[in-house]
Every structure is written in C-alpha cells, then in structure tokens.
C-alpha cells in the first residue's frame, strides 16, 4: 500500500468518514467534539493557531480496517503476522516535505503547535500521535508511540513509566550519564503507527514491520540536529533528547486507554532541539481511548498468535476483548489435543500485557460473550481449571495495583481452561438441535405451507406398527425421532401409541445414548449398581 497520510484523509472524506469543519473552533473544545462525533473531524480553523487539527481517525473498527486496506478485522491480524514474519527494511531518502519549515534553537516553540487538551483532569496539552524513533549503541533501533506533555516552549515530559524497549534505552542512557536522542514524527499514516506499536524483540526494527504492512519500504529521512531518521511522510517532526534526569519529574495526569484517568507519573524530561514541518502541515491528535484501542489491538492479536504458534497450539480464533480495554483480556479457541488447554494458557499468559485469558474449544464463538460464559459454566471446575500466576510483571496503568514510585509493579495473571475436560465423554456436550430443522422452515409456513395428515391407526394397526418398529430396533438402536421419520406414513400419535404398546409389553428399552432398543438385547443399557 503506497497511500500516504493525506491520501488516507481524502479516502475517509470520500466515504463520509471524515467531516471538515471550517468555522473557528476553540482548541479547548476539540476533544469533546471528537468524542461526540461518529466520524473523524478536520478542524481547519483552530482559534489562535496557524495549523489545522485532525482527530478521531481510527475511532472505529471499520476505520481501522480501512486504514490497513482490509475487508475484515481478522485480515488485519493476518496482515500484521505476515509483516512480522516478513519485514521490509526502511528506505532512506535525503529529505522530505517535512523539511519545508525548519526551526532550531530559540525558534523552537511548541506553543505554536495546536496541541489540544483531552480529558478534564489532564496535566497539560499532550502530543499523542508521535512515532518515536531512538537508537541504542548496542541494542539497535526502536520505534514506538509515546505521549509528551508540554511543559515549556521547548521542554516536555515523556511517559515511559511502563517497561518497554524505549524505557530500557532511556535507562541505559541515564545510567551512562548521557541524553537519548529521539525523533518524533507527527501526522504519519496509521500503518506506521500500527507497526511502531508492535512490541518487537530487541534488535527488530518496527519500521521494517510497518514496511511489511505496506508491502513496500517505509521512507525515512535524516534529522538535522540529531543522528536519527524520521518518517519522511510526516507532517511535523520534533528532534529531541530524553534528558538524563531519571524518573524524577511529575508527568500527567492523562485519560488512558483504560477509559480511566491515570495517576500522576514520574518520568524524565525531554528537550526539543528542532521543529520541522510542511508549510501547510496538519496536526494529528490521537483521541483517547478509542483510537489507541483500535490501533493497538491488532498488535495484541499478533503477539498472542505468535506465542501460541511457538507452543505448537492450533488456534482457531482470538478475541482481545473491548471490555478488557483491548489490552488485558483474551479469549482463545483452539483445536485441542489432550492437555493443550493448559499449554495454551501458559503460552498466552507469557504475552507481557495479558492479565486474564480464557481458552475454549473450537466449537465456541470467542466473539459471543454468552457462548464464552456458557463454556466457563459447563466445562470448568475451579480447583482444576483456573490457573493463577502471581508476581508477574504488570502494567503500571492497572488501577487495581498498589502504586509505588520507582517500582515496576507485579501482579497476578489468571487463566481459565474452559475446554472440555479430559476423561469426560464428548457426548456430554452434544448441543440441542431440533428434528426436521433441515426441512421445516418458518418462512414457508408464514407463506401458507401446510402439512398432510398421516395414517391414524386403530388398535390393530397400532399393534402391527409396533411389530414393525420392534423389527427395526432389533437390528440397531434408533432415536425416537428417527423412528417417527422412518414410519412417517403414520401420524405421530399412532407412532407414539405403537411405542407405548411395546413398553406395556415390556419389549422396549434404551441404549446408553438414549436410543430405543429391544429390552434385554445386546444394545440395552444396564441400570447402575446401587
């Protein structure tokens, strides 16, 4: 996919998924307007600012599929998995339109950028959609999405309280007493955001994963004041350094992906050394929480599937649920071999951010919460099928955890094996189905279809039919409905009377599966011993 950021905006506009607002709008109103809108919003005239703002681009599942050129949400997962397995390294170019205006030194002024506030208790304007690129001299290059709170015209905070590769890079730089250069590319295509949002192993370039998503290399261009690249298609680029202050400065609060207000964090400071942009740059503000949800969810799917593949588990479907903030909860259906319910849980729970996992058989629809709850209700014994792993690395944004400064939190991970237990006959889980469902259709009867009456037998005919039924079930056990079908020339009452006749004569019994058979025959079920 060669589409750039602006072409994506045009496509949203053409399909009615983006609305242009040309009237003056106060920047303080942007977040709530985006929250109320079903479409993305393009604010052409932000009061007091030169540049326009666009927000809410990926606020729905449908727009996330549009962004990655997919017809279904599952296709996004497949596409991302393909990109992870077959990354395409970035292509380096000399310059880009983001160099049309370059501001350095005292010219740097973040207050000239239309950076909105979001939630009512936010600690300040937040840059939310920047693709951040950093390099460690030993560990290689890393990309990710991090927020920056504006503190001064050329100073921000960065939220890297959560354990991740960027935090590791910053920690190593801090311990060496040096700043960590970073580039921040704002206004990139969602492909670059999705690629950089994947938590790749150290040494794997997330921009190469973004290239795999595109099917062609992501173009990167060199910064001016630091030895790092930026995304060439970006609207605005910040060249910066994470200062070696340690995690000592207050940062936040912020309305998080959890749909809750996050607490006050302690984080490093960031010095902005240069701002470059297109002459007519568009400022993209990623709206919380839903844009974060739909952009991040595919990376969770891919990570879970990769972990299960490594464990040798055959996966049918995965649902990273919205109720779990598309982050903490997963329901996974598998084609189970003995013992694999527990193996699947262990593999899935190894994915860092997952907190609660339910594994079900492949007859369960993981996207139907009633089906999943039914599987838990009918297939789980708590003492055998619920697994709790304590003291696992946890996400600091989990509000149920005790919060402590400077401590990477640990918490419990819970797995529920809601697959059919080993040793339980499969027929215990035969679902209710209805006789004649293949031919008796309600629409036909509403349209006037009628059924013909069968033979209504007298006592002699009932006795004769009983003998015929006895001959049939003497050869093989038959379900009651099969008998009614085999002797459909008679009306149902006559068939029922014939079976009653056999019961009175003490000739009728049932096999262990409930089928009708001859009493005392090899098929007959035996009463349990008292």
Region roles according to the model:
Residues 1-253, 257-269, 273-460:
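Extended, highly charged
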Residues 471-474, 496, 509:
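Nucleic-acid-binding small beta-barrel platforms of the OB/S1 family
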Residues 506:
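Glycine-centered, phosphate/nucleic-acid-interacting loop/turn motifs that mediate DNA/RNA or nucleotide
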């Amino acid at each position: 996919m060669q589409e750039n950021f602006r072409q994506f905006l045009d496509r949203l506009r053409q399909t009615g998924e983006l609305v242009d607002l040309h009237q003056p709008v106060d920047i303080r109103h942007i977040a709530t307007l985006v929250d109320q809108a079903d479409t993305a919003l393009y604010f052409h005239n932000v009061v007091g600012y030169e540049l326009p703002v666009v927000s809410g681009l990926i606020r729905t599942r449908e727009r996330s599929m549009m962004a990655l050129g997919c017809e279904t949400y599952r296709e996004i997962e497949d596409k991302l998995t393909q990109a992870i397995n077959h990354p395409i390294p970035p292509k380096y170019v000399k310059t880009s339109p983001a160099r049309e205006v370059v501001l350095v030194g005292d010219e740097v002024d973040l207050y000239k950028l239309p950076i909105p506030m979001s939630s009512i208790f936010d600690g300040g304007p937040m840059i939310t959609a920047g693709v951040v690129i950093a390099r460690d001299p030993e560990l290689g290059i890393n990309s990710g999405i991090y927020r920056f709170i504006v503190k001064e015209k050329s100073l921000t905070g960065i939220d890297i309280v959560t354990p991740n590769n960027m935090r590791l890079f910053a920690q190593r730089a801090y311990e060496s007493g040096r700043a960590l250069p970073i580039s921040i590319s704002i206004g990139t295509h969602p492909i670059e955001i999705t690629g950089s949002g994947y938590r790749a192993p150290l040494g794997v370039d997330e921009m190469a994963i973004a290239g795999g998503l595109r099917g062609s290399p992501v173009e990167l261009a060199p910064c001016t004041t630091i030895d790092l690249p930026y995304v060439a298609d970006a609207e605005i680029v910040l060249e910066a350094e994470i200062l070696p202050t340690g995690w000592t400065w207050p940062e936040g609060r912020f309305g998080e992906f959890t749909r809750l207000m996050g607490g006050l964090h302690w984080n490093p400071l960031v010095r902005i050394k240069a701002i470059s942009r297109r002459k007519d740059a568009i400022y993209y503000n990623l709206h919380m929480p839903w844009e974060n949800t739909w952009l991040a969810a595919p990376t969770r799917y891919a990570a879970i599937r990769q972990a299960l593949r490594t464990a040798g588990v055959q996966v049918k479907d995965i649902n990273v649920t919205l109720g779990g903030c598309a982050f903490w909860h997963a329901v996974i259906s598998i084609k189970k071999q003995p013992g694999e319910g527990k193996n699947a849980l262990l593999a899935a729970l190894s994915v860092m951010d997952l907190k609660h996992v339910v594994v079900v058989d492949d007859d369960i629809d993981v996207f139907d919460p009633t089906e999943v709850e039914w599987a838990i209700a009918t297939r789980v014994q708590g003492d055998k099928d619920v697994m709790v792993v304590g003291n696992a690395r946890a996400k600091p944004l989990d509000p149920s955890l005790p919060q402590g400064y400077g401590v990477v939190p640990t918490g419990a991970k819970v797995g529920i094996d809601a697959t059919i237990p080993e040793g339980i006959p499969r027929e215990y889980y035969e679902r209710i189905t209805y006789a004649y469902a293949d031919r008796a259709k309600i629409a036909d009867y509403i349209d006037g279809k009628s059924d013909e009456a069968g033979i209504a037998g007298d006592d002699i005919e009932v006795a004769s039919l009983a003998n015929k039924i006895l001959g049939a079930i003497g050869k093989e056990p038959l379900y009651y409905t099969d008998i009614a079908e085999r002797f459909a020339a008679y009306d149902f009452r006559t068939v029922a009377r014939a079976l009653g006749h056999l019961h009175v004569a003490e000739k009728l019994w049932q096999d262990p599966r409930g089928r009708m058979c001859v009493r005392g025959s090899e098929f007959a079920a035996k009463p349990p011993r008292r």
